[in-house]
Amino acid sequence: NEYENLIVTRTLSKAFALAGIRCGFAIANENLIKAMLKVIDPYPICDPVAQIAVQALSDHGVEMTKERALKCNERREKLEADLKALPFVKKIFVSFGNFLLVEFTDGPAVFNAMAQKGVILRSFETKKGLKNCVRISIGSEAELEELMRYLKALEI
């Protein structure tokens, strides 16, 4: 209401875990929505996708998404605390997402050792200013326990 020209867009991909349906939505004042409706296709998404989106955005769907996000945040906080105890962790960047970016004393060694164990991480070694950095996605409790078991066994 405060900004007549503001449009907020959101995707159902990440938080709602619906990347495959390729659907999002816009929130704006009524006049902007009316203008948008004049230029979009009459049927911009197929019926099955619309039905899934309606379910995801229902009270129950939103509540489930909030619960998943809270649990992900809890697992991220635990992982961060566990990583801080490792002697070869130099820095953990602030994160509000479903991952942690971690600077290790030897990022490539950590990345390669985890890859040999079948743990998929993402190296940021070649990104400017992120030498020795590895991104760790927040998985299930069991996956994170396995990751920590492997990391604790490393000799770096």
Predicted regions: what is each one?
Residues 116-117, 126-156:
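PLP-dependent enzyme catalytic core of the Aspartate aminotransferase-like
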Residues 5-83:
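PLP-dependent aminotransferase class I/II
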Residues 20, 96-97, 128-132:
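Short acidic/glycine-enriched loop/turn segments that link adjacent beta-strands
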